[in-house]
Amino acid sequence: MRKLLMILCTLLLVGCGTTKSVKVEQEVGLLQTVKERGYVICGVNSNLPGFSAQDESGNWSGLDVDFCKAVAAGIFGDSSKVEFVGLNASQRFPTLASGNIDVLARNTTWTISRDVNLMFEFAGVNYYDGQGFLIPTDLDIKSATELDGAFVCITKETTSELNLNDYFAENNMAYQPIYVEGNKDAKAKLFSGECDVFTTDASGLASARAGAEDPSKWIVLPEIISKEPLGPLVRQGDQEREAIVRWTHFIMINAEEAGITMYNVDMMLTAKSKEVKRILGVEGYIGPMLGVGMKFGYNIIKQVGNYGESFERNVGPNTPLALERGLNNLWKNGGVMYVPPIR
């Protein structure tokens, strides 16, 4: 009996050890696969100017595009080492789950069902948003509570559709859905008069309005009917890649807080601040802890910039979207951008 117990204990120990070994090999393999491939594959919105869109030459730009470039800069020291895959709302989750992309940075709301049921890991929030309504001014509507009976352009299988159902039910209103495949399709239907109103994240409405022939003929109603914390995500069980994606975002926020920009980053290498030195890899081992080089933070800021620079360049007041920082400002400037320190 004692011998049998010893055998069982040995098998259990070996089994536990094997599981751990396989897990470590899987984790290392996921990052190693990206390194051996030589570039990051990033899923983005196919057409959401300000966040992710292509110009006539096929070059991608936007807040989410910058984030993907930052991940590439952190891993490879080269922000161009990224391949973009344009995805619509229905394609994004199956594509991520299948492993055909490494990161999804596509204006995606962090929810419990996506976190738990779909087995994804959100790496943070890179844009705090809320759902609104875009209408033509000639409708002479001042409030979303006046939209009873409206034909509403809405993307199917999104949080926007669920929020819309809740809002209209709570206000004893009805609507006729006009389903669209994405922002490009929504704009076409809205501007042609096929629908009365387009509803999505307020940032998406600003992007749509900026693309109108005459933006002054379109207004975003004052009601914001939801919380939409948007951020990048990876598959669960992908700890190393998740850590790199998460700390890429944290580096960009911490750099802005520390006053490090893509223009002064070289000068900041000799700064006295210990925090600055850790961010830039002059001291500490932030990069190696993530499985990448010492210049992880330096390369991100040098090649892409801090979060504030990316925001201003892509969606800020001097862009067609003309968005204010609002909630997306640093915590010390009245916003909610607050991330863990580099220690």
What is each model feature region?
Residues 23-105, 330, 334:
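Extracytoplasmic small-molecule ligand-binding "clamshell" domains
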